[in-house]
């Protein structure tokens, strides 16, 4: 952290600070907890302005404000929900909703939303059982109580309601006494970090040592998330899907840093960033998240991310920023908030999409083959996909606002993320301060911070300097500060006076990042850009609540473009076009910043086999004979259909001579999986268990080296089948997609069930066996499987056999990629080697 002390003073003017509670509810970590941890300001201390306020107001007037009318059933938010004493079964749905509702209500200071929240809060606080348990009496599950505790935390910080602290104290005593007999399981075992965070918060209020014992017990009963993130162990649990469920993965990102406050070992502090590194390497997407539909789903541009994942990932980073004082945490948080979050919602915040895809060229009903598939999973609707997201999504923007600026133990403030807002709080021995943040960031590079004080006060103000910023600068009352560097937390510790002003300048340059299949995404500052696609909406259902509909979205303009980037300076190739700031910048046609770049259509790239999603982005460079034309890019979050992984126009350069892949260090570069799951362990790549999955794509899962193009060759790999099914090698493959036979090309597999080796081909999503021979395949035995392809003839060898165990002639496919495939089997692969003739 860069620190600078400034001993000079400036003229002041008068300022009146109103509506600030005199009592400071901020409590820092007590011993033996880790010191120097930042703390969230009481909710309501930060007021959104400008475009950020517009997002909250749309929530109020849209999905959040109308949620009880949209979901009036007793098992949802109806008056007979069990969270209001009725006979419904609200489980996690009500607590999810109330968690976001309370945060929105008190961030906006909205009486109507407060009233909606109060009935749930009062019922919960007034109906605690004598033993300390709260919530619906028949609900025997630790998990749903966790999000309700977040709602109570926010409510207490906003109101100082004296009922909350003894209520939570009583509950945690019950929990500590009963966890041995009734240990965490399933979702509670996955999401124990939430429980731990609230217990630590309460410890700092009461000093009750039993709360630290509770944190230890919760840590011991939870999944070993610190090890999972450190060692990329999401798939190491066989049929237990919890550690690879992407919402759990996102939600538990906070687990290591929460526990690090009690046990400040480097392994605990470092696990979050190591986990993110693993996730982004194996499953990363342009908007800053790992894919998950619902399980971790690889890097394909046609895999998606769930709305719950977006808001939980954000909350985890918001928690982490208070413990790990690194600029990259705020960078990552802004990237998700400014791209993924608005992309999940309709422009008016009335609808959401359960999943969104980096390359989502239409939004229509139909099955994709995801691990958890829903016919409405990418459709814009109040009811898109499964029910969890329509309740959990409400915390996204209000939690972002309330976590943007935090209190520091040395009685100062730290700015984690930027946006138009006002902060009113206490610093320097309970002196009132008001900081007005005037900016259109992230659509502009400049941010002004104006300090309001009734009397001078000495305190540190810590500013995050974005890692991506080129030559960032800060002026204090017109004077340039020195030693401002990108990627640092820059501390200004001085005596502040009324009307002091900081001018922050974070220059943004256009940049590209390599994505799946050697494609690129385009960014400027924290904003990722996508192709501007004209959209055509078709209402498919009108709901009883006025103004709420389901609608499909289809493209009304071409989308299959590649970028002509050439070899020149990127900032001369891609032009930045600025216009006036608008009330809601997340509407593509009125975006205040657009990019212009030359591109070409790629006629061979179209919709996939099921006509629901596009084929995955073709491997770059891609040749195109189409004319060059100027195309427009708009912010990722300003559209509900998009193209954000772009092919690059150029002469194709695929590997076609030889390739060796031993999987010594993890998942291979430029290999992509389609359907199911694939993971690395102990020097082998493995197909994952499909337990808990429901999509048609879970069988016949493929792992394809799309950057290869072989015609005649010797191709071999070690193959081990661990459960009943078949597994083997793919070759001369093109257009792989999600689905058992969703590819064009050949496959030779060892079938443990039938005791055969067979070779066949897929065409038009139909599988055709070309030839088969008996071969006793033993479970858990590694076989060396080899294919020799010469023209139309294929010879298959096993374990170095002198003669082919199988031969066949077929001329449909002349060249293509290589890959691995498993059908209904858990299989392991190693020692891939191919040499062209």
Regions inferred by a protein language model and the residue ranges of each:
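C-terminal beta-rich recognition modules with glycine/proline-rich loops and embedded aromatic residues
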Residues: 272, 331-339, 344-450, 485, ...
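Secretory/extracellular carbohydrate-interaction modules
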Residues: 695-758
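Short, solvent-exposed beta-strand-to-loop segments that form ligand-recognition rims
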Residues: 797-817
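Extracellular carbohydrate-recognition regions
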Residues: 41-51, 654-675
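Extracellular glycan-recognition surfaces and repeat-rich motifs
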Residues: 61-62, 66-68, 666-699
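Short tryptophan-centered beta-strand motifs in secreted/extracellular beta-sheet-rich domains
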Residues: 715-717, 781-790, 794-796
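Short, aromatic/His-centered strand-loop micro-motif at the edge of beta-sheets
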Residues: 763-784
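Aromatic (Trp/Tyr) and acidic
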Residues: 24-111, 145-158, 192-210, 214, ...
């Amino acid at each position: 952290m860069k620190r600078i002390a400034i001993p000079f003073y400036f003229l002041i003017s008068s300022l009146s600070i109103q509506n600030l509670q005199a009592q400071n509810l901020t409590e820092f970590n007590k011993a033996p907890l880790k010191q120097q941890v930042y703390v969230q300001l009481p909710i309501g201390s930060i007021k959104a302005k400008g475009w950020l306020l517009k997002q909250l107001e749309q929530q109020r007037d849209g999905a959040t404000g109308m949620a009880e009318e949209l979901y009036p059933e007793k098992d949802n938010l109806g008056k007979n929900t069990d969270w209001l004493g009725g006979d419904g079964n609200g489980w996690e749905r009500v607590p999810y909703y109330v968690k976001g509702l309370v945060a929105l209500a008190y961030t906006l200071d909205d009486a109507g939303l407060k009233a909606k929240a109060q009935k749930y809060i009062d019922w919960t606080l007034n109906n605690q059982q004598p033993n300390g348990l709260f919530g619906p009496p028949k609900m025997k599950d630790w998990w749903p109580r966790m999000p309700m505790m977040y709602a109570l935390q926010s409510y207490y910080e906003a109101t100082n309601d004296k009922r909350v602290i003894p209520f939570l104290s009583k509950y945690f005593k019950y929990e500590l006494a009963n966890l041995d007999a009734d240990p965490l399981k399933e979702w509670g075992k996955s999401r124990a970090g939430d429980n731990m965070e609230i217990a630590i918060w309460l410890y700092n209020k009461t000093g009750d040592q039993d709360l630290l014992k509770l944190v230890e017990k919760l840590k011991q009963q939870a999944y070993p998330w610190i090890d999972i993130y450190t060692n990329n162990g999401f798939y190491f649990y066989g049929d237990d899907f919890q550690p690879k469920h992407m919402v759990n993965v996102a939600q538990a990102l906070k687990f290591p840093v929460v526990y690090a406050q009690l046990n400040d070992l480097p392994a605990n502090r470092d696990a979050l960033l190591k986990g993110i590194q693993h996730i982004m390497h194996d499953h990363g997407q342009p908007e800053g998240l790992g894919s998950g539909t619902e399980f971790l789903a690889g890097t394909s541009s046609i895999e998606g991310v769930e709305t719950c994942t977006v808001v939980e990932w954000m909350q985890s980073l918001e928690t982490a920023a208070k413990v790990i004082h690194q600029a990259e945490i705020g960078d990552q948080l802004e990237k998700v908030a400014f791209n993924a979050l608005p992309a999940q919602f309709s422009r008016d915040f009335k609808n959401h999409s359960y999943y969104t895809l980096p390359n989502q060229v239409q939004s229509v009903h139909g099955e994709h083959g995801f691990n958890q598939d829903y016919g409405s999973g990418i459709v814009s609707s109040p009811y898109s996909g499964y029910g969890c997201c329509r309740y959990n999504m409400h915390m996204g923007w209000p939690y972002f606002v309330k976590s943007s600026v935090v209190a520091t133990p040395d009685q100062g403030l730290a700015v984690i993320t930027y946006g138009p807002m006002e902060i009113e709080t206490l610093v320097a021995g309970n002196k009132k301060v008001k900081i007005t943040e005037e900016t259109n960031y992230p659509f502009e590079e400049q941010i002004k911070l104006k300090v309001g004080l009734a009397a001078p006060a000495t305190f540190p103000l810590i500013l995050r300097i974005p890692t991506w910023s080129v030559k960032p600068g800060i002026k204090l009352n017109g004077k340039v500060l020195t030693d401002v560097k990108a990627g640092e937390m820059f501390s200004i510790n001085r005596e502040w006076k009324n009307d002091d002003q900081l001018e922050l300048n974070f220059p943004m340059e256009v940049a590209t990042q390599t994505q799946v299949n050697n494609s690129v995404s385009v960014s400027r500052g924290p904003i990722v850009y996508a192709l501007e696609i004209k959209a055509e909406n078709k209402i498919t259902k009108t709901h009883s609540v006025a103004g709420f509909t389901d609608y499909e979205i289809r493209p009304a303009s071409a989308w299959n473009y590649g970028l002509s980037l050439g070899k020149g300076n990127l900032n001369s190739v891609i032009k930045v076009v600025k216009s006036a700031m608008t009330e809601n910048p997340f509407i593509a046609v009125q975006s205040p910043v657009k990019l212009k770049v030359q591109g070409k259509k790629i006629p061979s790239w179209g919709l996939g086999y099921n006509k629901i999603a596009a084929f995955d982005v073709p491997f770059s460079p891609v040749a195109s004979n189409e004319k060059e034309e100027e195309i427009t890019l708009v912010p990722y979050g300003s559209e509900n259909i998009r193209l954000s992984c772009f092919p690059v126009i150029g002469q194709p350069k695929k590997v076609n001579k030889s390739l060796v892949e031993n999987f010594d260090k993890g998942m291979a570069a430029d290999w992509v999986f389609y359907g199911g799951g694939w993971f690395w362990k102990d020097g082998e790549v493995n197909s994952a268990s499909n337990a808990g999955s429901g999509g048609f794509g879970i069988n016949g899962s493929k792992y394809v080296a799309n950057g290869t193009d072989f015609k005649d060759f010797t191709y071999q790999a070690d193959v081990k089948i661990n459960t009943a099914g078949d597994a083997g090698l793919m070759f001369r493959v093109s257009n792989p997609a999600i689905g058992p036979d969703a590819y064009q090309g050949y496959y030779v597999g060892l079938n443990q069930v039938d005791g055969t080796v067979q070779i066949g081909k897929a065409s038009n999503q139909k599988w055709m066996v070309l030839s088969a021979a008996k071969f006793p395949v033993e479970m858990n035995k590694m076989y060396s499987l080899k294919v020799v392809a010469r023209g139309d003839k294929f010879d298959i060898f096993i374990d170095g056999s002198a003669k082919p165990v199988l031969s066949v002639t077929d001329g449909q496919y002349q060249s293509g990629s290589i890959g691995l495939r498993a059908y209904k089997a858990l299989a392991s692969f190693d020692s891939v080697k191919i040499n062209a003739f």
